[in-house]
């Protein structure tokens, strides 16, 4: 199997990964944010290669985790706009043997629930701690850690179930008396585009999931520029648009112009865009008209999201700076749309497949508008713009529903939709789509300067 995280398009054959159950694959990554929506690091969701189940990387999968995921190149992609990465796994001695291949100072190990502290695990934790690694554990599943002061002193973060946080506050305070630097991270069992409100997140140091943006309120109707962006979205999807008219719109919005300039100029993004899947290059080595149309759609979404964010701050009379922008919802939209695009290229016909990226991107229209789904799609009904959102929606509609359910961790529901639509979900391909989409999204964010100061690959 090819190493899907190699960012320069090369492949490395991994002859010893013929057993899917021993492979470690990235199912998802979730931002860990503060109450203002600033992402401090990402938490990986890992899966064995033979299943869509996710969670901790088991001991037998750690060799694959360190070889395939914890490389310098893949860590940089997975870290995205942050510097650090949280990895749910067990502290085997292999982490020490492979420490030169990654930087322990930028890794937070989320220790397995109710972990049994073997001599191997204790020694590894203590030695990794000296190298700068940080550790996290669930407060309701500390196992032997709670009674081992030496290991407890290595813990930097405590995870707590949001719904049960009140009942654990006494325990948390007791642990903080022993270890004052402990930070509390709240989590929910359900994942959505926005997992926490600002009010919910204020009671914790961090939350696992995206904090909602300020919603924009309207006195009578939306600003003219929002209507113009929504109309442009619809025109781009339909492919019925005047290039000169689009050019005028881009010229009138500096953010759109900067976005297009950055994306078109990025050789790395071009390379990732023209790749038909995660391991091979397409025959064409240049961007197609559909690729450029997708770039235009991204520039529309970026402009709409950023200007609306600015106006929402102004409405609340809060000083605004681009440094305050919580881009995570926009990043989620990019990543989701690209996975839809990659899956559609393998499944849909040549007429439908080119529509896939924008169709998936439009699923996040309410995010760009800083509005509720109900209000947005009542005014901007997706089924009126894209046929894949009508009843049934064909293969593309099924792909979007399946991937949205997988994104929300509703695995059984996703499998039911796939079976009813006659689609076979090949695990190896899906994990390939995910890894390719993350690398591509990272390249887009760099081109848009959402990831600051990153050099062209």
Say what each PLM segment does:
Residues 187-457:
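Conserved alpha-helical "signature site"
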Residues 75-76, 147, 246:
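Generic recognition of flexible, low-complexity loop/linker segments
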Residues 95, 167, 256:
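Short phosphate-engaging motifs
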Residues 4-106, 113-119, 328, 332, ...:
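Bacterial c-di-GMP phosphodiesterase EAL domain
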Residues 101-213, 352-355:
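The catalytic core of metal-dependent phosphodiesterases that act on cyclic dinucleotides
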Residues 68, 72-77, 127, 174-175, ...:
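A generic secondary-structure signal
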Residues 38, 82, 153-154, 200-203, ...:
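Short loop/turn motifs at secondary-structure junctions
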